[in-house]
Amino acid sequence: MAKLILTQEVAGLGTSGDVVEVKNGYARNYLLPRGFATVWTKGGEKQVESLQKARAARAVANLEDAQAQAAQLQSAPVQLERTAGAEGRLFGAVQTADVAEAIEAAGLGSVDKRSITLPAHIKSVGNHEAQVRLHEDVIATVQLQVVAAKAKK
């Protein structure tokens, strides 16, 4: 097992500054080459402690901001306009990047596409839901209205 310090958030593993133990192959072949982690040292541990103190102070402010944004996201549905066939099937699927753009266009704030989770592929016109992870403790459910785009003549 390899002991590492994460330099970025890794899904299912931790956030920046966390000390984790992973299998050697995962560390050697994935985390270290991509710059997601560095090797743990005693000096690095002191640096991690100072980073965690600073992060704890920021987390309180970020939590309040995330809760406010979650309330805003849940207050109104987000409308996405896509080209669709006669029976309501979309030409292509709605992606997380499309949802992020629609949220920003609706004036509900900026959301990273990697923090959006779609429960299933959205390939039809209608009402759907998406989960947005704004903070470790705050997950907002966004109502999506997918409508067919009007034909241009």
Curated annotation (Swiss-Prot):
Record family assignment: Belongs to the bacterial ribosomal protein bL9 family.
Organism lineage string: Bacteria, Bacillati, Actinomycetota, Actinomycetes, Micrococcales
Primary role: Binds to the 23S rRNA.
GO molecular function: rRNA binding; structural constituent of ribosome
Superkingdom of the source species: Bacteria
GO cellular component annotations of the record: ribonucleoprotein complex; ribosome
Name of the protein in question: Large ribosomal subunit protein bL9
GN (gene name): rplI
InterPro entries: Ribosomal_bL9, Ribosomal_bL9/RNase_H1_N, Ribosomal_bL9_bac/chp, Ribosomal_bL9_C, Ribosomal_bL9_C_sf, Ribosomal_bL9_N, Ribosomal_bL9_N_sf
Any single Pfam family the record assigns to this protein: Ribosomal_L9_C
GO BP terms in the entry: translation
Species in which this protein is naturally found: Micrococcus luteus (strain ATCC 4698 / DSM 20030 / JCM 1464 / CCM 169 / CCUG 5858 / IAM 1056 / NBRC 3333 / NCIMB 9278 / NCTC 2665 / VKM Ac-2230) (Micrococcus lysodeikticus)
Keywords from the named record: Ribonucleoprotein, Ribosomal protein, RNA-binding, rRNA-binding
